[in-house]
């Protein structure tokens, strides 16, 4: 025997198409016609059931696609996490190396720091870079260089507890990955269970379906995704983006090479600056060149640059101090400047890997949320059909009673105030009363459609959750 919901719906449709819907005038005929719904058997399968079965298969195919995407995302996420840990390990190694070099250099330069500091803070440096604007970038570079030297000569001892949040963060990341895996696995189990129950319904009703639908349902061909699939707010990453990998050893070697060239550049610019300062007296001794620097600059800078013409002898002392400072740095601390640059780049590498991991993590979470949303939406739309597999073959729809109930309006009872009520027992749901308003009477062309819609709505509302 067909599942009772199917029989109920198709009988209603048969009544509608046959134009034999009962009228309000003949309540006895109404009662007998409604009771006969469960006795009609040889009718084609209802389109609502076919639509629901098709939707369940679409749900299954969608989940298979999402599972592949989720697997790729999780694989990329774990790979990014490994690279982030490698970057942190590399940073720790650079820090340890730098700390050792700083310790040795600190011992060598402690006595000569005064000369280096006066070199940096001397007014001649300020005057010269003001009068020669093209050297301002050189000055900034040198100042940054000396600030780093000062920091390691007089280090600020940070609290070692900063390592604790890192370990806690790793534990938190492990928990996040595990939770996402568990949630997606549960979604997969739920969808497979729903599909298996719905497939049992298809097997029970297979003889009632046409051959085209049977072939369509049992085929492995991908179906077009349902029209209600929501569009993702983000464009999906390309495969190249997902599989991007940092070659950390080679990448870091580039940083090392770059840092060496920076140090050499700093040393070279210091030498050029000092040589230029040394040549200034020769220029001032030339005829008609007195105050040449002041004449070449705007009014607000002339006074300052005039000091350079008047204090050349003092700037020679500045020149000598900077030469000593440069010699101390190059001889006693050859590796420290390069290591500071390497440390900066190692920190940048850690930040880049953290940012990359965060982006992939956000994308994976969004993918999981979208998948859960689609599963819930499709389950609510089509999942009710799986409950038909739980019904015994002899289960039928039973119409217990039919009655017309008048509504009292200002003490008058009229035919237009009557409401038809029928008690139904449908599938696993408890008995319920269907109230049919006057505008949906049996004389109306919408009568059967109204009853069908109400029956399906009642069943879906009482469809059990996962």
From Swiss-Prot:
Its main location: secreted. Glycans are attached at residues 196, 257, 311, 351, 412, 431. Residues 1-20 form the signal peptide. This is Clusterin-like protein 1. GO terms for cellular component: extracellular space; nucleus. Belongs to the clusterin family. Keywords: Coiled coil, Disulfide bond, Glycoprotein, Secreted, Signal. The keyword Mitochondrion does not apply. It comes from Homo sapiens. The gene is CLUL1. Disulfide bonds join 105-333, 116-325, 119-322, 124-315, 131-305. Residues 57-111 form a coiled coil. Transmembrane segments: none annotated. It is found in: Secreted. The keyword Glycoprotein applies.
């Amino acid at each position: 025997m067909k599942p009772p919901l199917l029989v109920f719906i198709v009988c209603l449709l048969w009544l509608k198409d046959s134009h034999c819907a009962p009228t309000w005038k003949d309540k006895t005929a109404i009662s007998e016609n409604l009771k006969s719904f469960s006795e009609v058997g040889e009718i084609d399968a209802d389109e609502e059931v076919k639509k629901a079965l098709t939707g369940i298969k679409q749900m299954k195919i969608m989940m298979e696609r999402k599972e592949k995407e989720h697997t790729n995302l999780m694989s990329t996420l774990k790979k990014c996490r490994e690279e982030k840990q490698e970057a942190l390990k590399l940073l720790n190694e650079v820090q340890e190396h730098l700390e050792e070099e700083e310790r040795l250099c600190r011992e060598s330069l402690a006595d000569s720091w005064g000369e280096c500091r006066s070199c940096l803070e001397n007014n001649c440096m300020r005057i010269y870079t003001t009068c020669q604007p093209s050297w301002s970038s050189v000055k900034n570079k040198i100042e940054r260089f000396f600030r780093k030297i000062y920091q390691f000569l007089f280090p600020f001892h940070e609290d070692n507890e900063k390592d604790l949040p890192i370990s806690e963060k790793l534990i938190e990341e492990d928990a996040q990955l595990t939770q996402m895996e568990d949630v997606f696995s549960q979604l997969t189990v739920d969808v497979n269970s729903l599909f298996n129950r719905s497939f049992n319904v298809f097997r029970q009703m297979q003889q009632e379906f046409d051959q085209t639908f049977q072939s369509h349902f049992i085929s492995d061909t991908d179906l077009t995704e349902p029209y209600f699939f929501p569009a993702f707010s983000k464009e999906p990453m390309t495969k190249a983006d997902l599989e991007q990998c940092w070659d950390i050893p080679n990448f870091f070697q580039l940083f090392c090479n770059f840092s060496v060239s920076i140090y050499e550049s700093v040393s070279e610019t210091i030498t050029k600056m000092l040589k230029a300062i040394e040549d200034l007296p020769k220029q001032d001794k030339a005829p008609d060149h007195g105050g040449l620097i002041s004449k070449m600059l705007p009014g607000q800078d002339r006074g300052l640059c005039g000091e350079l013409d008047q204090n050349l002898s003092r700037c020679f002392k500045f020149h000598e101090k900077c030469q000593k400072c440069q010699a101390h740095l190059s001889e006693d601390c050859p590796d420290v400047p390069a290591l500071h640059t390497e440390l900066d780049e190692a920190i940048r590498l850690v930040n880049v890997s953290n940012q990359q991991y965060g982006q992939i993590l956000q994308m994976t979470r969004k993918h999981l949320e979208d998948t859960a949303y689609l599963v819930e939406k499709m389950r609510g739309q089509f999942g009710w059909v799986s409950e038909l597999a739980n019904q015994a073959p002899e289960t039928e729809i039973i119409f217990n009673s039919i009655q017309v109930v008048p509504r009292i309006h200002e003490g008058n009872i009229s035919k237009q105030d009557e409401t038809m009520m029928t008690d139904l027992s449908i599938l696993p749901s408890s008995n319920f009363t269907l109230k049919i308003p006057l505008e949906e009477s049996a004389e109306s062309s919408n009568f059967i459609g109204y009853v069908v819609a109400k029956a399906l709505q009642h069943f879906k509302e009482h469809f059990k959750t996962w």
